[in-house]
């Protein structure tokens, strides 16, 4: 609210995933749904310009989407979003585990590990000319 009052645009973020502690661990699905919807309405009242959330059950996402007064950006929530989104790192395959709704278009984790190993080996063999590479002649 303080940021909004200071004229700074704010996008709210919540959801059912582990990154969202305010929903509460150990609660029933119904309690989580009520908490989620309450948090979304509170963010709207505080003046957010949009809400982002992840992994919300379809029926809850639908209810929130129908009640929302701001744009909704969501991942893993079905069609009930103004703009579906996907985590960039999952899209590029930087994560070993992917959420069931996420599709990887490459395996950059493996490629990054291999590139790093090659770099380390070149350093160990003394093949990197540090002074030249950083512009010190």
Please name every model-derived segment.
Residues 1-137:
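Alpha/beta enzyme core
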């Amino acid at each position: 609210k303080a940021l909004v009052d200071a004229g700074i645009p704010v996008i709210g973020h919540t959801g059912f995933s582990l990154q969202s502690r305010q929903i509460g661990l150990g609660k029933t699905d119904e309690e989580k749904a009520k908490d989620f919807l309450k948090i979304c309405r509170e963010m709207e009242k505080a003046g957010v310009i949009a809400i982002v959330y992840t992994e919300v059950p379809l029926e809850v996402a639908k209810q929130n989407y129908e009640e929302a007064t701001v744009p909704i950006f969501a991942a893993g929530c079905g069609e009930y979003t103004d703009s579906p989104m996907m985590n960039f790192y999952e899209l590029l395959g930087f994560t070993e585990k992917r959420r069931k709704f996420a599709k990887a278009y490459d395996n950059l984790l493996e490629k990054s590990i291999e590139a790093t190993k090659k770099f380390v080996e070149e350093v160990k063999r003394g093949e990197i000319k540090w002074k030249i590479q950083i512009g010190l002649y």
